[in-house]
């Protein structure tokens, strides 16, 4: 969990100081991505490209120019996606070729690209989905509110990017723990005694299952909440209300960063419970 900041000398900085600098740079661009904001990004991008550093072939000087764009870089990436050649195409330098931008076209391209991809018989999207599924995807794209609100959101973005690691690690560790809950009776050759007792097949078994699920619940939520608050405490809580499309342009889920976090947390929990039950 960390960010990189390119300073005025073209050198990379990391650590909490880099986080603070990136937050400050991106907060300067906070606001709705309307016509005025998009035009400002295009103009600033063109101004930087016209500098000696922006035109230099020297990697060090070129990095200085890249550093100047860090404040609006996520917005520039959206322009790359919107004005790309198609739904599945990407070119880092697309935004550099855009001299005039339209708010309507910027958001409209997202819908146009997915429609073309789904209806082009020569593309994989045409045969990948049924007509009802295509209609649903397009409806979801059209239902997304615009303009987007931009704010520093690196904490939430990195949290969502890495959130799947903890459940996978938890499944691995808890799998070993859960595996012994019932198998130990057979290992110790006590199963005949255990299951022949008055409550061996009922209350005792039920208690073991409940204890196993409780263990999964406590370990999972403790680990996930600690990781989440550590990440957000270090990188920042700002940007919770930003839509996920600020970083995942093609997403058909019209939810915010914090809603995606809640969804990911519960999906991971259900997955852990299922695998724990399966292991037991």
Language-model features: locations:
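Hydrophobic transmembrane alpha-helix segments characteristic of membrane transport
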Residues: 188-192
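Secretory targeting signals
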Residues: 2-29, 106-185, 206-279
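Membrane-proximal extracellular/periplasmic loop immediately following the first transmembrane helix
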Residues: 2-117
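Generic transmembrane alpha-helix motif of multi-pass integral membrane proteins
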Residues: 194-195, 278-280
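Long, hydrophobic, well-ordered secondary-structure blocks that form the structural core
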Residues: 193-194, 217
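Short helix-to-coil transition segments within interhelical loops
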Residues: 195-201
